[in-house]
Design a protein with these regions (language model features):
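C-terminal motif of bacterial Sec signal peptides marking the signal peptidase cleavage site
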Residues: 17-20
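A ligand-binding cleft/hinge motif common to bilobed small-molecule-binding domains
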Residues: 115-118, 280-295
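Conserved C-terminal helix/tail region of periplasmic/extracytoplasmic solute-binding proteins
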Residues: 269, 376-412
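Extracytoplasmic ligand-binding site segments that recognize negatively charged/polar headgroups
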Residues: 53-67, 110-266
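Early extracytoplasmic/lumenal segment of secretory-pathway proteins
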Residues: 36-119
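Bacterial signal peptide processing site
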Residues: 22-25
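Mature extracytoplasmic/periplasmic domains
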Residues: 306, 310, 314-382
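Periplasmic-binding protein-like
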Residues: 138, 249-253, 293-316
Length: 412
């Protein structure tokens, strides 16, 4: 069995921390409902319940409200009769909290790798029956059996699948080129070190940082390049010395940050009105801003980047499992995959979507990082065992990442 149990005991505590910062059983309508929590709940998709509730990142579940060209919800509703309701979450911790507190309320969640295993180990999500998802074999082989959504929970030597890959991408350095005068920033130092920007003014108070605890890994990526004596190899497996160094860098950054962002649309407003000029960000914000003003651009700093590979997971007490399975299948259609990749600036989980999509264009996947998969430090939940079997190694677990980053943001 994959070793992820050493942080299981803190899962509910993390949910409480996240909720501080930031039902009933459903009738499946299908057949064969195993009692074993390690087995899929249904063996065939029955009649839809008329609705499905999804927790997602902003921009992931679009019905054309922001831009009529991007709508993959309305066609699903028309085809299945399942009305989609969407709750957006701003951090992985918020997603975990919503799912753990939302039994009987939510069906699905688009979980990143720093949330997915917490949801599995707390039995908040259920294993999926891939036989009910006919398009699963179209998923990129890099993602089909990825460790952030496949776990051998019953110890039989075969991993169960808990998620359907959705999209993947990486965190970019968003900047305003009107401030940088055509000199694209090549290092994360622009958000970590006080300096004079090309417009002749200090960066102090004009940069932002992500307010999720997983951002500590971004500091570790920066330190790996600039302080090699620390010996950082994995930004999610930090020993005490490495972790303390990352915290010290983040405390230094605290003096520069104008806002810790978690709401993508608030960050868009901050850049649009000039309050922010550089920050870690998602391609989504860049795309929305650049559509109005081409001065808003992004770069990939030389130190490297963190990123996410998101999978759609089903709540153990999903009230609408039939509609949920219908959405899981729908989520893999080429048009949705390509349109979403164009909208968010990500790479589709279904690689055939990279060709022939009018919005994405045939060059879109390469532009969004298709060739960089092996260079991205994908989000994972930090564990005390450092992801290995060596009892001599000990890393700082995620609970402490959460509590310490909250303290940094609070000025402590």
């Amino acid at each position: 069995m994959r070793k992820i149990s050493r942080w299981l005991a803190v899962g509910s505590v993390i949910a409480l921390v996240a909720s501080a910062c930031g039902g009933g059983d459903g009738d499946s309508g299908g057949s064969g409902t195993p009692a074993d929590p390690d087995e899929p709940r249904i063996t065939q998709v029955g009649e839809g319940e008329g609705e499905v509730s999804i927790i997602s990142w902003a921009g992931y579940i679009e019905r054309g409200d922001t831009d009529p060209a991007y709508d993959w919800v309305t066609p699903f509703e028309e085809e299945t009769g399942c009305a989609v309701t969407n709750k957006t979450a701003n951090t992985s911790d918020e997603m975990v909290a919503l799912m753990q507190e939302g039994a009987g309320q939510y069906d699905l969640v688009t979980a990143s790798g720093d949330a997915s295993l917490r949801l599995v180990e707390s039995e908040t999500v259920q294993p999926l029956n891939l036989e009910l998802i006919e398009s699963y074999d179209t998923v990129d082989p890099n993602l089909q059996d990825a460790p952030w959504h496949t776990v051998d929970t019953d110890g039989d030597g075969t991993a169960e699948h808990y998620g359907v890959p959705y999209q993947w991408g990486y965190n970019v350095l968003l900047y305003n080129d009107a401030i940088f005068k055509g000199q694209a920033p090549t290092s994360w130092d622009v958000v970590f070190e006080e300096q004079t920007l090309p417009d002749g003014k200090s960066n102090k108070g004009r940069v932002q940082a992500y307010d999720g605890a997983i951002y500590i890994a971004d500091a570790a990526v920066y330190l790996r390049a600039h302080d090699p004596d620390l010996g950082i190899t994995d930004p999610y497996a930090l020993n005490r010395e490495q972790f303390d160094a990352a915290l010290n860098l983040l405390r230094q950054q605290r003096e520069l940050v104008g806002r810790y962002w978690h709401d993508a649309f608030v960050q868009i407003d901050d850049f649009g009105n000039g309050e922010a000029v550089a920050s870690s960000s998602w391609p989504f914000q860049r795309n929305v801003l650049a559509a109005e003003d081409p001065d808003f651009k992004s770069s990939t700093p030389e130190e490297g980047v963190t990123g996410w590979a998101d999978t759609t997971m089903m709540h153990s007490d999903a009230p609408h499992p039939n509609c949920a399975y219908m959405w899981l299948e729908w989520s893999l259609n080429e048009k949705l995959q390509g349109d979403l990749a164009a909208w968010f600036g990500t790479v589709p989980a279904v690689l055939s979507a990279c060709q022939g999509n009018e919005l994405l264009t045939d060059e879109g996947c390469e532009t969004n990082g298709l060739g960089d998969f092996d260079q991205i430090e994908f989000w994972r939940t930090p564990q005390a065992d450092c992801f290995d079997d060596d009892e001599a190694t000990e890393c700082v677990p995620y609970l402490e990442w959460v509590t310490q980053y909250v303290a940094v943001i609070g000025g402590r």
